[in-house]
A protein has these predicted regions:
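Conserved N-terminal beta1-alpha1 strand-loop-helix module at the mouth
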Residues: 1-197
């Protein structure tokens, strides 16, 4: 089971996730509406998450040495000709109808299926993604995942990976990622299906 922890805002959080051998780390860039938005300089060595980036932004990210780019909006026109970063195309439950046009896009290495408001901690009806064909591309489930529901989500959907942000944060009184919640989430997500549920 691959695990992605998204929305890191502080370099020390990278240490927390590295201790747990998390597969992917995401940062929110070029989206100031998010409370997790940070600068490119702050995010240079970890994976990023963008909402409809410009071609220039994608090229900057590629030059910074990232391995993937997660895009919530449209993939920029001319992407395949100008950039070589594999795309994790994010879909929220409101734009699932757009899935077929991306399933054949050679730039798309995988999908992230999320709630209507990514990063909100809201769970969506997982049955909505059960009919999505699981092809040779990575299939991540996101949207309100936390210690209490990640094992059930994995058992129900059988994704290649899970993506969490608010589910491993401290809470209302303190911002940032909680190392204990990260440890517990990773442990639960990596349990064989059927154990501890």
């Amino acid at each position: 089971m691959k695990i992605k922890i998204c929305g890191l805002t502080d370099p020390k959080e990278a240490g927390y996730v590295n201790e747990q051998r998390v597969d992917f780390i995401g940062m929110v860039l070029f989206f100031p509406k998010s409370k997790r938005n940070i600068t490119l300089d702050r995010a240079r060595e970890i994976m990023k998450c963008l909402v409809t980036p410009t071609l220039g932004q994608v090229q900057s990210i590629e030059q910074a040495g990232f391995d993937y780019i997660q895009i919530h909006g449209e993939i920029p026109s001319g992407y395949s000709e100008s950039c070589h970063l594999p795309v994790l195309k994010a879909f929220n439950i409101r734009d699932m109808r757009d899935f077929p046009q991306y399933s054949t896009n050679p730039a798309v290495a995988g999908y992230v299926f999320d709630a209507a408001e990514p990063g909100s901690g809201q769970v969506f009806d997982w049955n909505l993604v059960k009919e999505i064909p699981q092809d040779d591309k990575l299939f991540f489930l996101a949207g309100g995942l936390n210690l209490g529901n990640v094992a059930e989500a994995i058992s129900c959907i059988h994704p290649d990976g899970v993506d969490v942000s608010s589910g491993v944060e401290y809470g209302k009184d303190r911002t940032g990622k909680d190392p204990e919640k990260i440890r517990a989430f990773v442990s639960r997500a990596r349990q064989p299906v059927g154990e501890g549920v």
